[in-house]
Swiss-Prot record:
The protein's role, per its UniProt record: The alpha-V (ITGAV) integrins are receptors for vitronectin, cytotactin, fibronectin, fibrinogen, laminin, matrix metalloproteinase-2, osteopontin, osteomodulin, prothrombin, thrombospondin, TGFB1 and vWF. They recognize the sequence R-G-D in a wide array of ligands. Alpha-V integrins may play a role in embryo implantation, angiogenesis and wound healing. ITGAV:ITGB3 binds to fractalkine (CX3CL1) and may act as its coreceptor in CX3CR1-dependent fractalkine signaling. ITGAV:ITGB3 binds to NRG1 (via EGF domain) and this binding is essential for NRG1-ERBB signaling.
Organism annotation: Gallus gallus
Basic and acidic residues bias locations: 1013-1028
Topology feature Extracellular, residues: 20-978
Record-listed Ca(2+) 1 binding positions: 248, 252, 254, 256
List of residues binding Ca(2+) 3: 367, 369, 371, 373, 375
Name of this chain's protein: Integrin alpha-V
Transmembrane segments: 979-1002
Quaternary structure (record): Heterodimer of an alpha and a beta subunit. The alpha subunit is composed of a heavy and a light chain linked by a disulfide bond. Alpha-V (ITGAV) associates with either beta-1 (ITGB1), beta-3 (ITGB3), beta-5 (ITGB5), beta-6 (ITGB6) or beta-8 (ITGB8). Interacts with RAB25. Interacts with CIB1. Integrins ITGAV:ITGB3 and ITGAV:ITGB5 interact with FBLN5 (via N-terminus). ITGAV:ITGB3 and ITGAV:ITGB5 interact with CCN3. ITGAV:ITGB3 interacts with ADGRA2. ITGAV:ITGB3 interacts with FGF2; it is likely that FGF2 can simultaneously bind ITGAV:ITGB3 and FGF receptors.
Protein localization: Membrane; Cell junction, Focal adhesion
Region of interest (Disordered), ranges: 1013-1034
Glycosylated residues in this chain: 62, 278, 284, 540, 601, 690, 821, 837, 860, 931, 951, 959, 966
Record: residues binding Ca(2+) 4: 431, 433, 435, 437, 439
Length: 1034
């Protein structure tokens, strides 16, 4: 239901701008005294065939009655330009008394004018809050009273002012709360407070009310009165008579009585229909939701033209669930269509805005647009902008009520001390200006306003548009355009106008013709009018109302085929007409309007003759295939990919044929292969439509039968995600042909693969240590690093050379720290650079040696620098003590193990492990270890555990390396000084070379200064042809 309401609201928004024949732009506005509630009730009044007025109730207006405050008025207003409103005097007396200082009645605040109805020259107006003091008790009772005016006199009609007093009788009747006239010259009065507020309907004949009136009689009994009687206590507080209407529901030609009972059935609400002959019950309609006030308003009219009266019931407090699932008060109108076979077909119409009180008032409008079906108005007096009020106009049709309003009237008055309540009262179905169309009055008592909307005469237009011929042969050039033969055709357009009601005899229309309408603005239109060489033509036409068709004919021509591409799409000839409203206005200033249910435009099509057989319909047979030599793409690499595409047409011509390549998000289009003579050089463009990336290539217009094209398209694939396993390209040929305009979709899929060149390398800094160390003395309990021995760093770098990234690598380091209970390399600390976490199987720096601050370049020593340093010293460069070199590694020494987990590493990135240690010099200074050379070796290995690409497999990737620090007993070689004679000889050679250079430059005039000429004749003359053979080529 919420979805239906939303769709109807959208429809309303669209149709509201399509103003139908109520003149909402120039309404007649009437204003009353501020605070008088002018507009609380409205009606039309026709005292004779030549007169028409508006009736407006103002129940809180002050009158000239003696000692009466806010007695209320009914005002009579002119509908034409003189919008003067004058009160009708129904009662000029003050309160009557039983005796002096013993009042009979209380007319102050009686709300006279709260209900008003008229029929011909008679007006019934009521004061439902009128009080009187009964003859037997001193209590005031709101029995209500009415006055019936017949043009010559006004008589009081107070059927509830009877001897049946108190709440259990008619003492709280509030007679006249709702009223109506029947066609049979009866009045119907609702009194919702009778019988403990069960409510009551009372009907009397107009003639008897007039005849039996006696100002001295307070309680009048009528012989032909029809009235409902009290029911059981279960019906208390039901409010029968809250709203009333009349209509024939028995088929006997006599109008029956309809009444809303909004609090009946435990507040579900009811509407009851009583027989117009004897007040017997005929039908009961029960609401479906508690407290919706079902029956707040009722109305009757034949909405579907089947000659059976239909019933409309308002429930302004009805709640429906919104899009969020919560209940919202939107209001509802029930449409009860009376069937010929008996019973009713019921439909529901929900409101569109919350708290708008949709259905508060319902008014039959008569046949507003003269289409043969009656229409209705439904008010939402607190809807719209700032709750100014809305009135929806619904049109009848053979199937019932059109659920989409044809017009929405909006209140234009801002709130004062209370909401404007525009639409609280409605009255239609009366032609106030005698133009053949019924009009509508809308009351807005919150701003003391009534508004008259007159219906505009509806013009029905019959239009015709013809094109001859409809098949345009570009080769048949029968017309001349500036001595050039062109292919031409004729455009004929006709208009005829008629309508009901008062319309001028001549109607002026502006007709607009447009050739090739479907081409967007700025595009080349393929056809032009011969006389103007333009695609559009305007014409003013005068049409006689009810006359014959008025026609005109124009020549148009087809442009040369070289001027446009689209030869397949039909050429649309479009005609639109508009009424000149200024020349059609009547004497009262009312404009007619075109029938909005008939489009004011039409179109025809012409086709260009194609080489497509006798039927002029081209049916191509399009095929596309694709291949590539590249079968695998490595993630992380900038992979060039060339697709070789074959496009064929084995059928008839394909117009505006294009190759569409859907580009996956992992790829970018580079261009077309142009360095291969075997491949066609297509014209291609990259486009994005609705977030779909595509390459569109032109294949010809037309792509003739038998065409076969071979082309190469270059892409770069480099934006793979972690979940991708392949890259897919979709290809299709599309044309503008009507039939068989698409080829089957071809696709090329290339698989993704992982490749990562991971390497590990290490370096020792320094790589040689020479013993003994000068001035070094061992300490039994070392406290600082220098107390232990010289610094030894091993640096390991794990580098990913790509192209693919990895997400997890395990690296294991083996470190020789003890041999035969002698400490070798004592690790002081280790540090990392990059996404790496490490743990060791033994405590680092267990002696808690104080760690010295690193030098500035100690940690940042690079591998390139380490490789280029002259650490490698051969044995012949050393004066070493002869002896074997003993290797101490994890094969013969105790090793500490460090395990590192390396995280995500992109191509070209590294993770580095810095191991800072001290050579335990005391070990090598022992006598048994002296005069020997040692090679201390640490090792590192890695294994790639995981890649971030979840759906791809990979091969085992691992490697290892060894870092060596050499310990040598001997004398460290010193660099030899350069001899003095070599230095002297080099200086002399440099001076000799400088002298030679100076001599050569002197000989060439380098040191000679060139001065500018002093005399005019010394200046060099400019030669005109010095720099070429003539200035004409410049």
């Amino acid at each position: 239901m919420a979805a239906l309401r939303a769709s109807l609201l959208l429809s309303c928004a669209l149709t509201a701008a399509r103003a139908f024949n109520l003149d909402a732009e120039r309404p007649a506005v009437y204003s009353g005294a501020e605070g008088s509630y002018f507009g609380f009730a409205v009606d039309f009044f026709a005292p004779d065939a030549s007169s028409m007025f508006l009736l407006v109730g103002a129940p809180k207006a002050n009158t000239s009655q003696s000692n009466v405050v806010e007695g209320g008025q009914v005002l009579q207003c002119n509908w034409n330009s003189n919008r003067n409103c004058q009160p009708i005097i129904f009662d000029s007396t003050g309160n009557r008394d039983f005796a002096p200082d013993d009042p009979l009645e209380f007319k102050s605040h009686q709300w006279f004018g709260a209900s008003v109805r008229s029929k011909n020259d008679k007006i019934l107006a009521c004061a439902p809050l009128y009080h009187w003091r009964t003859e037997t008790k001193q209590e005031r009772e709101p029995v209500g009273t009415c006055y019936l005016f017949d043009g010559s006199k006004s008589v009081e009609y107070a059927p509830c002012r009877s001897t049946t007093i108190d709440a259990d009788g008619q003492g709280f009747c509030q007679g006249g709360f709702s009223i109506d006239f029947t066609k049979g010259d009866r009045v119907l009065l609702g009194g919702p407070g009778s019988f403990y507020w069960q409510g009551q309907l009372i009907s009397d004949r107009v003639a008897e009310i007039l005849a039996k009136y006696d100002s001295k009689v307070y309680s009048t009994k009528y012989d032909d009165q029809l009235a409902t009687r009290p029911a059981s206590a279960a019906f208390d507080d039901s409010y029968l008579g809250y709203s009333v209407a009349v209509g024939d529901f028995s088929g006997d030609g006599i109008e029956d009585f309809v009444s809303g009972v909004p609090r009946a059935a435990r507040t579900l609400g009811m509407v009851s229909i009583y027989n117009g002959k004897n007040m017997s019950s005929m039908y009961n309609f029960t609401g479906e939701q508690m407290a919706a006030y079902f029956g707040y308003s009722v109305a009757t009219t034949d909405i579907n033209g089947d000659d059976y009266t239909d019933l409309f019931i308002g429930a302004p407090l009805f709640m429906d669930r919104g899009s969020d699932g919560k209940l919202q008060e939107v209001g509802q109108v029930s449409i009860c269509l009376q069937r010929a076979s008996g019973g009713f077909q019921i439909a529901k119409l929900n409101g569109f805005e919350i708290f708008a009180r949709f259905g508060s008032a319902i008014a039959p409008l008569g046949d507003l647009d003269q289409d043969g079906f009656n229409d209705i108005a439904v008010a939402a007096p607190y809807g719209g902008e700032d709750k100014r009020g809305l009135v929806y106009i619904y049109n009848g049709r053979a199937t019932g009520l059109n659920a989409v309003p044809s017009r929405i009237l909006e209140g234009q008055w801002a709130a004062r001390t209370m909401p404007p309540s525009f639409g609280y009262s409605l009255k239609g179905a009366t032609d106030v200006d005698k133009n053949g169309y019924p009009d509508l009055i809308v009351g807005a008592f919150g701003v003391d306003t009534a508004v008259l909307y007159r219906a505009r005469p509806v013009i029905r237009v019959n239009a015709a548009l013809e094109v001859n011929p409809t098949i345009l042969n570009p080769e048949n050039k029968a017309c001349s355009l500036a001595d050039v033969k062109v292919s031409c055709f004729k455009v004929k357009f006709c208009l005829k106008a008629d309508g009901k009601g008062k319309l001028p005899n001549s109607l002026n229309f502006q007709v607009e013709l447009l050739l090739d309408k479907l081409k967007q603005k700025g595009a080349i239109r393929r056809a032009l009018f011969l006389h103007s060489k333009q695609p559009s033509h305007s014409k003013n036409m005068t049409i006689t109302k009810g006359g014959k068709m008025n026609c005109e004919e124009l020549d148009a021509f087809l442009r040369d085929e070289s001027e446009f591409r689209d030869k397949l799409t039909p050429i649309t000839i479009f005609m639109e007409y508009r009424l000149d409203y200024k020349t059609a206005v009547d004497a009262t200033g009312l404009h007619p309007i075109l029938n909005q249910f008939i489009p004011a435009n039409m179109s025809r099509q012409a086709h260009i003759l194609l080489d497509c057989g006798e039927d002029n319909i081209c049916k191509p047979k399009l095929e596309v295939s694709v291949r590539s030599d590249q079968k695998k793409i490595y993630i992380g690499d900038d992979n060039p990919l060339t697709l070789i595409v074959t496009a064929e047409n084995q059928g008839e011509g394909a117009y505006e044929a294009e190759l569409f390549v859907i580009v996956p998000p992992q790829a970018d289009f580079i261009g077309v292969v142009r360095n291969n003579e075997a491949l066609a050089r297509l014209s291609c463009a990259f486009k994005t439509e609705n977030q779909t990336r595509m390459v569109v290539c032109d294949l010809g217009n037309p792509m003739k039968a038998g065409t076969k094209l071979l082309a190469g398209l270059r892409f770069s694939v480099h934006q793979q995600s972690e979940m991708d396993t392949s890259v897919k390209f979709d290809l299709q040929i599309r044309s503008s042909n009507l039939f068989d305009n698409l080829s089957p979709v071809a696709f090329y899929q290339v698989d993704l693969a992982i490749s990562a060149a991971v390497e590990i390398r290490g370096v020792s800094s320094p790589d040689h240590i020479f013993l003994p160390i000068a001035n070094w003395q061992p300490k039994e309990n070392p406290e600082t690093e220098d107390d232990i021995g010289p610094l030894v760093q091993h640096i390991y770098e794990l580098r990913n050379n790509g192209p693919s990234a990895f997400s997890k690598v395990m690296m294991t380091l083996q470190w020789p720290y003890k041999y035969k209970n002698y400490t070798l390399l004592y690790i002081v600390q280790y540090d990392i650079d990059g996404p790496m976490n490490c743990t060791s199987d033994m405590e680092i720096n267990p002696l808690k040696i104080k760690i010295s601050a690193p030098k500035e370049d100690e940690k940042n020593e690079t591998f390139s620098r380490e490789d280029n340093r002259n650490h490698r010293i051969s044995r012949r460069d050393l004066t070493a003590i002869e002896g074997d070199v003993q290797t101490l590694g994890c094969g013969n020494a105790d090793c500490l193990k460090i395990v590192c987990q390396v995280g995500h590493l992109e191509r070209g990135k590294s993770a580095i492990l810095y191991l800072k240690s001290r050579l335990w010099t005391q070990t090598f200074m022992n006598k048994e270890n002296q005069n020997h050379s040692y090679s201390l070796q640490s090792s590192a290995s890695f294994n790639v555990i995981e890649f971030p690409y979840k759906n791809l497999s990979f091969e085992d990737i691992h490697n290892s390396t060894v870092v060596t620090t050499n310990i040598t007993w001997g004398i460290q070689p010193q660099p030899m000084p350069v001899p003095v004679w070599v230095i002297i000889l080099a200086v002399l050679a440099g001076l000799l070379l400088l002298a030679v250079l100076v001599l050569v430059m002197y000989r060439m005039g380098f040191f000679k200064r060139v001065r500018p000429p002093q005399e005019e004749q010394e200046r060099e003359q400019l030669q005109p042809h010095e720099n070429g053979e003539g200035t004409s080529e410049a």
